[in-house]
Amino acid sequence: MLRTPTDETRLRILAWLKEPGPAADGVTADAVAERFSIPRPVAVTHLRLLEATGMLRTSRSAGRVRYHRDDMRIAEVARMFEKGW
């Protein structure tokens, strides 16, 4: 499971979520699909994998799931990779 973030699309999603707009508001699966020109089910899969590893957290707004970075968890995983896990 720790290899999950190494997928190029997932890394790009995490990077995008650092930008001011997405960082403040979070993003929906539809927004990810549009931004990266991927089908919505593929976007959902990427987001759920990132959530399962704790790198994303979710909130609900107007009945929609919004995804946000969990920078503390991302830093923790990065340290694990640096140690060779």
What are these regions (language model features)?
Residues 1, 63-65, 79-83:
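Short, structured secondary-structure boundary patches
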Residues 3-39, 61-73:
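N-terminal helix-turn-helix DNA-binding core of bacterial DNA-binding proteins
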Residues 34, 51-52:
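Alpha-helical residues within the helix-turn-helix
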Residues 47-48:
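Short, hydrophobic-biased segments on the C-terminal half of alpha helices
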Residues 69-85:
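Conserved segment of winged-helix/HTH DNA-binding domains
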